[in-house]
Amino acid sequence: MKKGTAYCLVLTVVMVALFVLNLVKGSIDIPVGDVVNILMGDTENVKPSWQYIVMESRLPQALTAILCGAALAVCGLMLQTAFRNPLAGPSIFGINSGAGLGVALVMLLLGGSLSVGSVSVSGFVAVLAAAFIGAMAVMALIFFFSTIVRSHVMLLIIGIMIGYIANSAISLLNFFATDEGVKSYMVWGMGSFGGVSMKYMGTFAAITVLGLVGSLLLMKPLNALLLGDRYAENLGVNIQKVRNWLLFVTGLLTAITTAFCGPVAFIGLAVPHIARLLLTTDNHRFLMPATMLCGAVVALLCNVICVLPGESGVIPLNAVTPIIGAPVIIYVIIRERR
């Protein structure tokens, strides 16, 4: 499909341009030439402070945005296809809420001295481990119920209920927590691509790429599922096996991104629809790579918008993502009604 290939190439160019812009823009604007020299290792005529800003702050943020955006977007695409629900997203199963509960247990019960942006190594690992365990605990429940409930709609409802239970527990923890603990948790809940330092980038990237590769293995089964479960079974697709693999990959990607970046909103829900509108196809052979690229582009764009105030501060990520995501979802709902 020439159109799909062309759009993927365009999205790649846009992603590279936004990646460079992420390295240039911030509280201090750094010339593109100096950024290139820093990345190439030619730092002889570059300010040491600029080198530190690019290598220790902006580069990991940009890489995190690419990986997180691609991961959440693919999760949304797989869930929307598998459940034939245009409003399905990574948070629909309560995975984000499970991760949030894990972080709340660390931040609120252990004195509230931790924050995602600035912690000791042990504290940072504790936050990440708690988020990951919480998210995967929810996934274990979803796996269990998927063996009992065959209806896609009922499984979605169960996921929503699990999310409500987790959010209720978080509210109780906030009620009994200290002011410092509540503030610390709120900062994490705002979402940020700045929570992954270069020290942890290898771990984050390895797990995320592993999940993305796993999602690519589902392209053919997802195309079959578009025609209905019965048709897919006639083609030899093991529906239960595909569903379990899909839930595992979705859980892994959502857990790792939420643990490192907080509960990032709307990217998983809106980006698959943006990709569909661009390609005007449901063929996952082209749609899935385009969704990954589109997710990375949207995440990089949001990160640039977050730093636009410059020296005045950084806008919370979850204050920006709805600006892009909400209009897309409203358009999809109106189109579905027609």
Q: Which residue ranges define each predicted feature?
A:
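Alpha-helical transmembrane segments in inner-membrane proteins
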Residues: M1-R338
